[in-house]
Amino acid sequence: ELLNTADPLVEEFKNTPEGQWLYNNSWKYGFVLRYLPEKKDITGIISEPWHFRYVGIPHAEYMTEKNLSVEEYINYIKEEKMIIFEDFNGNKYQIYYVQKGNHDILQDDVFDSEKLVNVSEIGEDEYIITQMMDESIND
């Protein structure tokens, strides 16, 4: 049983043992708190301490470390085009932003379809591609 409270969809959820556990550990499983109180101006939504969203591993850890909302994370990936990230287990990832019709990155020697973790559609004809890295890439 995940919840001991009668109604988890209330502001007080963040103060329950379950709410605290989710807040502190959800990123390890690919989830983020969707609407953070300090991000209301960015998301347009008030804090919802019960509203967790699956964004995947390693994205949730990266977003949590950098205190990024989903909107900020997507914009960051779009600006950077590619980031490299090592998670708390020592797994290394390359995360790319790709637009339909711009497949240069897929032709690049860096991209390896055998190491593909996932492809997430983030908008019309926009994608985030995540792949594992070998240790040798950083050596």
Segments from the language model and where they lie:
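Cell-envelope/glycan interface and biosynthesis
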Residues: 1-86, 94-107, 111-138
